[in-house]
C-alpha cells in the first residue's frame, strides 16, 4: 500500500511535476543541508524520498508507481486545487472516516495502489517518514481514503469514531456462529441483489434480521477495503438502491461518490454502450428471458437517448422505479465465490 508518494500526481493533467523529479529535487536539497553522519532514516523508517528512490530502482515497483501516478492523478488534481497536488492538505479533513461518507476513490486508483503494494519496495512507501516535506505530508492525507483498510480506523475502533474495514468486519462475523449463519442465508437469498436485478422479500427479511445482530450490523457500517473492494461497493450500492430505495453516498457503510471521478474514467465506455445499445434489440424479461415489446416510457427517448441496454444483453433493473442497473454488475456466483474467498487474501 502506498500513502507517501511525494507529489503523487505523477503525470497528472495540467502539467504537474512528476513525482520522481520531485523526489530527486528533495534528495539534492536534503543532501546539501543534512549534517555529516546523519542517517537517511528515522530509526527504522525510511525517509519517503529514499523509499521512492528504492522503488524506482526496482523495475516492478517503478512500473507500478507509474501506473499509480496515472490512475490516481485525478484524485490529487480534484482535491488538491487543480494542478497543485501539494495543496491537497487544505482540502482534506484529518479524518478519512468523515470524508468517506461523501467521496469514493476511483477503482482504477485503488487497483493501482494494490498492485504497487504487491511489489517488493512498494509497501515501504506507506510506512516512510515525510520528515519536514509538507508536499509529502499533504499527499499522504490526499491518498489515504484510497488505501485498503482491514481494521478499525483508529485504536478506539468504530465506537471511538473510527471506521472499520469490511474485511475485518467479515472476519468477526465468521467467528460468530449466529452471524455466520445469517451471512450464509444472505448469500443464499440475495443473489439477485448481487447482480443488480431486484431485492426479494426474502432477501429484505434476511437483511433486517442481520441489522439486529451487533456483529452482522458491522457489515452494514463498514467501509469496503482490500482486494474485493470494488465488488463490495457494488453489492452495497445495489442493496441500498434495490432493498431500501436509498441513494449511495449518505450512509456510513459506503465510500460515497458524487460521480465526478468515476465519470472521468467511464466516458469512453459510455460512448461504446450508446453505440451498441442503439439497435433494435428487444429487452428480455428478468425472469423468463423471453423478448417482450418495449415497456411504456422506456427506450432511448425516456432515458435521454441512451437506449434500453445499460450494461448487458437486455438486462435492466426491475427495482427502483425503472432506473438503470449499475454497469459491470457481477453475477451472483462470482460475487459469492469472491466474498467467500475474501478472508483468504
From Swiss-Prot:
Membrane topology: Lipid-anchor; GPI-anchor
Origin: domain of life: Eukaryota
InterPro entries tied to this protein: GAS1, GDNF/GAS1
Gene expressing this chain: GAS1
The name this protein goes by in its record: Growth arrest-specific protein 1
Gene Ontology cellular component annotations, sorted alphabetically: membrane; plasma membrane; side of membrane
Region annotation Disordered: where it falls in the sequence: 254-328
GO-annotated molecular function: oxysterol binding
